[in-house]
Amino acid sequence: MSIRPLHDRVIVKRKEVETKSAGGIVLTGSAAAKSTRGEIIAVGKGRILENGTVQPLDVKVGDIVIFNDGYGVKTEKIDNEEVLIMPESDILAIVEA
């Protein structure tokens, strides 16, 4: 299935978080926090400004990002994979190699 977000929305596939503590203890359940890093897998066309022009997004498909996992983030299952749909404003940073 193909999915295309609208306007300033992006679709992110969450990256797996390390499940071991610094001391080597395997974390489970609530002790294993969900990662706030992910890969952009789709982007909308951009934010519509008051004058009607479209401002392109700063992120692109393939970017690794750090995001705010909060109120505006919607979790969906696409082709048996969990993805996150969020506005670009919930992205805090792009991880550069």
UniProtKB/Swiss-Prot annotation:
Belongs to the GroES chaperonin family. It holds the Pfam family Cpn10. Heptamer of 7 subunits arranged in a ring. Interacts with the chaperonin GroEL. Together with the chaperonin GroEL, plays an essential role in assisting protein folding. The GroEL-GroES system forms a nano-cage that allows encapsulation of the non-native substrate proteins and provides a physical environment optimized to promote and accelerate protein folding. GroES binds to the apical surface of the GroEL ring, thereby capping the opening of the GroEL channel. Its main location: cytoplasm. SUPFAM superfamilies: GroES-like (SSF50129). NCBIfam families: PRK00364.1-1, PRK00364.1-2. Keywords: Chaperone, Cytoplasm. It is found in: Cytoplasm. One of its GO terms (cellular component) is cytoplasm. One of its GO terms (molecular function) is metal ion binding. GO terms for biological process: chaperone cofactor-dependent protein refolding. This is Co-chaperonin GroES. The keyword Protein biosynthesis does not apply. It comes from Klebsiella pneumoniae subsp. pneumoniae (strain ATCC 700721 / MGH 78578). PROSITE patterns: CHAPERONINS_CPN10. SMART domains: Cpn10. InterPro entries: Chaperonin_GroES (IPR020818), Chaperonin_GroES_sf (IPR037124), Chaprnonin_Cpn10_CS (IPR018369), GroES-like_sf (IPR011032).
